[in-house]
């Protein structure tokens, strides 16, 4: 579950980073 899809996609990681 991606908290912030922008950070999730932007970071290109598997884990959704809230703090980027």
From Swiss-Prot:
Catalytic activity: Cleavage of the triple helix of collagen at about three-quarters of the length of the molecule from the N-terminus, at 775-Gly-|-Ile-776 in the alpha1(I) chain. Cleaves synthetic substrates and alpha-macroglobulins at bonds where P1' is a hydrophobic residue
Note describing how the cofactor binds: Binds 1 zinc ion per subunit.
Residue ranges of domain Peptidase M12A in the record: 1-20
GO BP terms, alphabetized: collagen catabolic process; proteolysis
Domain of life: Eukaryota
Keyword NADP attributed: no
InterPro entries in UniProt: Peptidase_M12A (IPR001506)
Key words of the record: Collagen degradation, Hydrolase, Metalloprotease, Protease, Zinc
UniProt GO MF annotations: metalloendopeptidase activity
Enzyme class label: hydrolase
Record-listed E.C. numbers: 3.4.24.7
Coiled coil: none
Cofactor dependency: Zn(2+)
Its job: This enzyme is a metal protease capable of degrading the native triple helix of collagen.
Name assigned to this protein: Collagenolytic protease 23 kDa
């Amino acid at each position: 579950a991606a908290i912030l899809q922008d950070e999730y996609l932007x970071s290109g990681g598997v884990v959704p980073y809230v703090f980027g």
